[in-house]
C-alpha cells in the first residue's frame, strides 16, 4: 500500500493475495481505490497451518472477503495455481464455509453467500472486478452444470460441471 501511496494509484491497480488485512488497511484500500484479488482456497488448503502458526489475534484478518465487500473494496477471486489448487470451486466453497481441510472454522465472519462467491470469478482478465455478460458480441464463455443453481449452492463442487465452453469452443465435456 505504501508503494501505491508513493507512486500514485491508478484505475485498475489492485493487490494480489491480501493475506492479512487488518481494519486500518481497509481504510487505506478505500482511500487509494485499490481492489483485492484474493484466494479463499488457502483457508481450506492451508488454514490448519495458519491456525497453528499465525498469532490468534490475526486470524480474523486472514483472506478477508465479507468485510472488504461490505466496506466497498472491489474483490475478485483467483486460486494462485500452481501454489493453490486450480479448481475455482474449492475457492468458492472456502469463501462460503470458511472451513479448513480438517473442518476447523477460520474467519467465519468473512463468509459470503454462494452466488457472491461465484461472481468473484466472473470478471474479465483485464478487469476482474467487472462482471462479464452473456450478450451478442461477447465471448461465449460458459460453464454448464448438471443440476440447478439453487441445488448447487449447497454443494459447491467441480463434480457438477458437465461442460466448459471458452470463446464458443468446448474445452471440457464430462460426456
What are these regions (language model features)?
Residues 1-13, 18, 23-147, 164-165:
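His/Asp/Glu-enriched, well-ordered alpha-helical/loop segment
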Residues 157-159:
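Short, small/polar residue-rich loop motifs at catalytic or cofactor-binding pockets
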Residues 174-175:
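Short linear motifs in exposed loops
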Residues 149-155:
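Short, Lys/Arg- and Gly-enriched loop/turn segments at beta-strand edges
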Amino acid at each position: 500500500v505504501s508503494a501505491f501511496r508513493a507512486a500514485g494509484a491508478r484505475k485498475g491497480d489492485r493487490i494480489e493475495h491480501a493475506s492479512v488485512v487488518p481494519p486500518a488497511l481497509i481504510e487505506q484500500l478505500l482511500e487509494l481505490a485499490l481492489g483485492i484479488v484474493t484466494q479463499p482456497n488457502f483457508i481450506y488448503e492451508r488454514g490448519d497451518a495458519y491456525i497453528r502458526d499465525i498469532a490468534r489475534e490475526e486470524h480474523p484478518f486472514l483472506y478477508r472477503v465479507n468485510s472488504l465487500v461490505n466496506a466497498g473494496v472491489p474483490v475478485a477471486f483467483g486460486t494462485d495455481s500452481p501454489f493453490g489448487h486450480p479448481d475455482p470451486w474449492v475457492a468458492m466453497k472456502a469463501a462460503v464455509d470458511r472451513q479448513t481441510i480438517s473442518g476447523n472454522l477460520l474467519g467465519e465472519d468473512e463468509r459470503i453467500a454462494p452466488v457472491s462467491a461465484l461472481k468473484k470469478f466472473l470478471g474479465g482478465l483485464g478487469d476482474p472486478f467487472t462482471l462479464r455478460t452473456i450478450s451478442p458480441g461477447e465471448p461465449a464463455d460458459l460453464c454448464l452444470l448438471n443440476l440447478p443453481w439453487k441445488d448447487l449452492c449447497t454443494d459447491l463442487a467441480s463434480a457438477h460441471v458437465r461442460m466448459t465452453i471458452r470463446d464458443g469452443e468446448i474445452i471440457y465435456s464430462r460426456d
